[in-house]
């Protein structure tokens, strides 16, 4: 009888440990992939992947509405293609995203209202073109707009 109780207790403990490990794994997965910082970084990554492919039309769609006021979609597409592809003499670039940090608030321009709950990161684009190899280093911000993370650049003087 004692042996059966011990065996039952060991099995119950094993099941409890197994379920705890599963629950912890699910929580870590959710925290990692559904956290605001991960989602913000994913939006910036998607933007620069589209830019890398020369798909400036779709990358423009990932801008915050305040960025879209700076250029029409057509002007953005033409300007990006002209500067990067023609002037730099490159077909594409590589990039990395570093240092995702949450900021309580941040302003795109000095005379603008601050965005709350912004994520700041550094994007390093590496070009290998007719003028040699060079890096373009830029602070990039992810801002929530209508439930989606959107890309914003810094225009403060």
Pin down the residues of each PLM region:
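Short, low-complexity N-terminal intrinsically disordered segments enriched in polar/charged residues
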Residues: 2-53
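Low-complexity, intrinsically disordered short segments enriched for Gly/Pro and polybasic residues
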Residues: 42, 48, 88, 131-132
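Short solvent-exposed beta->alpha transition segments
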Residues: 57-116
């Amino acid at each position: 009888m004692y042996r059966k109780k011990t065996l039952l207790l060991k099995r119950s403990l094993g099941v409890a440990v197994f379920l705890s490990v599963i629950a912890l794994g699910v929580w870590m997965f959710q925290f990692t992939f559904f956290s605001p910082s991960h989602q913000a970084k994913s939006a910036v990554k998607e933007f620069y992947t589209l830019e890398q492919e020369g798909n400036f039309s779709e990358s423009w769609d990932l801008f915050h509405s305040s960025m879209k006021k700076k250029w029409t979609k057509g002007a953005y597409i033409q300007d990006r293609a002209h500067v990067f592809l023609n002037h730099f003499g490159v077909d594409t670039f590589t990039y990395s995203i570093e240092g995702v940090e949450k900021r309580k608030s941040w302003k795109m321009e000095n005379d603008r209202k601050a965005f709350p709950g912004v994520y700041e990161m550094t994007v390093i684009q590496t070009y290998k073109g007719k003028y040699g190899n060079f890096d373009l280093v830029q602070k990039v911000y992810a801002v929530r707009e209508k439930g989606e993370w959107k890309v914003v650049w810094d225009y403060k003087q």
